[in-house]
């Protein structure tokens, strides 16, 4: 993997901050865009900027077709069964809030458990805390070692018959740790 080539795809990463190349880890809040995405957004604003699924005029229909075509592309990329399984949100925070307010409110009951890691972004802690206050669920936390790695043996001990969901960051925007989510 050529990291320099990947960085070159992201115009903003050509900047320096305090005399050093920009490194950006806060992708849960806003993800930097590669040139291809920036160009597509500019093209959208110049040629088909209209409400999706909200109009019968030409631009709205064209914008809707492009929107749904992108949903199909994402469906194929993540190997989803149907396009209605792909939900677009503005970012991780909104996605987690949607998960908690749909799955959590509907399917979790007092005494049920969610497992998080000690390295979670605030956006993956607060919604679960609010759900715990509303519904009496328990939040369990996976500890980590001095190297910033999750303790997987401790993680396995957290599971009970009341565990309903595990919500763990794959790559920590604070530590840079890549968690072994496939193994988890």
Can you say where each PLM-predicted feature lies in the sequence?
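Pyridoxal 5′-phosphate
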Residues: 1-184
